[in-house]
Curated annotation (Swiss-Prot):
Chief localization: secreted
Presence of keyword Nucleotide-binding: no
GO molecular function: toxin activity
Subcellular location: Secreted
Protein name, per record: [Ala1,Thr6]-phyllokinin
Keyword Secreted: yes
Family stated for the protein in its record: Belongs to the bradykinin-related peptide family.
Protein's organism: Physalaemus signifer
Summary of the function given for this chain in its UniProt record: Produces in vitro relaxation of rat arterial smooth muscle and constriction of intestinal smooth muscle. May target bradykinin receptors (BDKRB).
Keywords tagged on the record: Amphibian defense peptide, G-protein coupled receptor impairing toxin, Secreted, Toxin, Vasoactive, Vasodilator
Gene Ontology BP term (one): vasodilation
UniProt superkingdom: Eukaryota
Length: 11
């Protein structure tokens, strides 16, 4: 997974 990947969106 890429370094900025998250299982949910964080804004």
């Amino acid at each position: 997974a890429p370094p900025g990947f998250t299982p949910f969106r964080i804004y």
